UniProtKB/Swiss-Prot annotation:
The keyword Cell inner membrane applies. This is ATP synthase subunit c. It comes from Pseudomonas aeruginosa (strain ATCC 15692 / DSM 22644 / CIP 104116 / JCM 14847 / LMG 12228 / 1C / PRS 101 / PAO1). It is a multi-pass membrane protein. F(1)F(0) ATP synthase produces ATP from ADP in the presence of a proton or sodium gradient. F-type ATPases consist of two structural domains, F(1) containing the extramembraneous catalytic core and F(0) containing the membrane proton channel, linked together by a central stalk and a peripheral stalk. During catalysis, ATP synthesis in the catalytic domain of F(1) is coupled via a rotary mechanism of the central stalk subunits to proton translocation. Key component of the F(0) channel; it plays a direct role in translocation across the membrane. A homomeric c-ring of between 10-14 subunits forms the central stalk rotor element with the F(1) delta and epsilon subunits. HAMAP family: ATP_synth_c_bact (MF_01396). Belongs to the ATPase C chain family. It is found in: Cell inner membrane. The lineage of its organism: Bacteria, Pseudomonadati, Pseudomonadota, Gammaproteobacteria, Pseudomonadales.
Length: 85
């Protein structure tokens, strides 16, 4: 049982860590492309900004879903019940 709990802790750490890393890379690329587009066509900034914030919200949503799944595995681990039962 300790092995399952330990491996679950490692999986949770990877889930949160890699999710945060992916979001950080995504935000970096998104911000860079937004600034590039704004410098190229300044009249398009309001439309680009709206689209940037929509995509930023979707990037955050993916990370928050990962955090929710990680919290589920941390506090209501379904794998421990399968071994004990």
């Amino acid at each position: 049982m300790e092995t399952v709990v330990g491996l679950t802790a490692i999986a949770v750490a990877l889930l949160i860590g890699l999710g945060a890393l992916g979001t950080a890379i995504g935000f970096g690329l998104l911000g860079g492309k937004f600034l590039e587009g704004a410098a190229r066509q300044p009249e398009m900034v309001p439309m680009l900004q709206v689209k940037m914030f929509i995509v930023a919200g979707l990037l955050d949503a993916v990370t928050m879903i990962g955090v929710g799944i990680a919290l589920f595995f941390t506090f209501a681990n379904p794998f421990v019940g399968q071994i004990a039962g």
